[in-house]
């Protein structure tokens, strides 16, 4: 093949919100800042409540606490940089910083998905095998499950980041996104095998996510079958209520992800791509603590008992 003169890229420019009207950027900054702070405070409140309330020292709430940690870290990996770019004219990011951001976003994102799977398994064991629950979900087993979710997320993050950053980037250094998004970054690669790399990355990611979703759905098939065998309507309602918050978060998580990554090509613009991406990176983590604190009665009561009534006592 004839040799080509490539200008190797050492840093990237995040174009994300650069095309937006300037008067909208402070509004978006304020909106995303409030959502970011609420995400942090909401998840910290859940973690503090579980730590304080000894009745919540159960496997289900251990997994929920770990989920809150993963959501905080996922949000911190992306949102602060996005907020800074909204008010700045300097949007460059170094090669190493871009690789780090991609690794941590994938690591915490996949850890979140694996934790949702583990929480589904926990509900399956609690409802379908209640007599064996203490054996199957012992503290040691729970610790192993949590460790596996973090290890799995780390492996996925390292795998994708290593594959992508082994490519050579040349020509334009503009990433048409507000963070180092893998598909936007791959468009800047100058090697002939880029298309096969894209297919490989997509296959790895989709297989892992669809695999998690399939196992969650399978667990709920068995859960619903077990609930339908409960004779009283009150018993069925009480049992299913323990699953509602988890199921709602799963539906929200996968719905937004599917809408962003599986949308038909051509039905998007630079504006809509950036805004839709924030639904998954900002809005979904923002919703999660709201869903768990409102839909989980036991957690809601514990928050009221330990925080709301202390700081906002009822007027006499």
UniProtKB/Swiss-Prot annotation:
Keyword annotations from UniProtKB, A to Z: Cell membrane, Disulfide bond, G-protein coupled receptor, Glycoprotein, Membrane, Olfaction, Receptor, Sensory transduction, Transducer, Transmembrane, Transmembrane helix
GO molecular function (one): olfactory receptor activity
UniProt keyword annotation of Transmembrane present: yes
Classification via Gene3D superfamilies: Rhodopsin 7-helix transmembrane proteins
Regions of this protein lying in the Extracellular compartment: 1-26, 77-100, 162-198, 261-273
Signal peptide: none
Record's bilayer topology term: Multi-pass membrane protein
GO cellular component: plasma membrane
Gene Ontology BP, a term: detection of chemical stimulus involved in sensory perception of smell
Sites where a glycan is attached: 5
Chief localization: membrane
Similarity comment: Belongs to the G-protein coupled receptor 1 family.
Function: Odorant receptor.
Listed name of the protein: Olfactory receptor 10H4
Lineage: Eukaryota, Metazoa, Chordata, Craniata, Vertebrata
């Amino acid at each position: 093949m004839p040799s080509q003169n490539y200008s190797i890229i050492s840093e990237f420019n995040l174009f994300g919100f650069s095309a937006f009207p300037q008067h909208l950027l402070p509004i978006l900054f304020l909106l995303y800042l409030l959502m970011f702070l609420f995400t942090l405070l909401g998840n910290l409140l859940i973690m503090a409540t579980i730590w304080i309330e000894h009745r919540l020292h159960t496997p289900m709430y251990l997994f929920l606490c770990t989920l809150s940690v993963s959501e905080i870290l996922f949000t911190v990996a992306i949102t602060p940089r996005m907020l800074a770019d909204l008010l700045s004219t300097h949007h460059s990011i170094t090669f190493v910083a871009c690789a780090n951001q991609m690794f941590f976003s994938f690591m915490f994102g996949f850890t979140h998905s694996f934790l949702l799977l583990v929480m589904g398994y926990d509900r399956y064991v609690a409802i379908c095998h209640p007599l064996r629950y203490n054996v199957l979900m012992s503290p040691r087993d729970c610790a192993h499950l949590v460790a596996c979710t973090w290890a799995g997320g780390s492996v996925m993050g390292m795998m994708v980041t290593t594959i992508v950053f082994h490519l050579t980037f040349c020509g334009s250094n503009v990433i048409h996104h507000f963070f180092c998004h893998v598909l936007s970054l791959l468009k800047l690669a100058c090697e002939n095998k880029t298309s096969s790399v894209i297919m490989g990355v997509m296959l790895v990611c989709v297989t892992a996510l669809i695999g998690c979703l399939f196992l969650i759905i399978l667990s709920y098939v068995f859960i619903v079958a077990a609930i339908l065998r409960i004779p009283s309507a009150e018993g069925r309602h009480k049992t299913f209520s323990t699953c509602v918050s988890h199921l709602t978060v799963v539906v929200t998580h996968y719905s937004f992800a599917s809408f962003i990554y599986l949308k038909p090509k051509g039905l998007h613009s630079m504006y809509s791509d950036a805004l839709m991406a924030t639904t998954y990176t900002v809005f979904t983590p923002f919703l999660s603590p709201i869903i768990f604190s409102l839909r989980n009665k036991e957690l809601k009561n514990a928050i009221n008992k330990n925080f709301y009534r202390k700081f906002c006592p009822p007027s006499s």
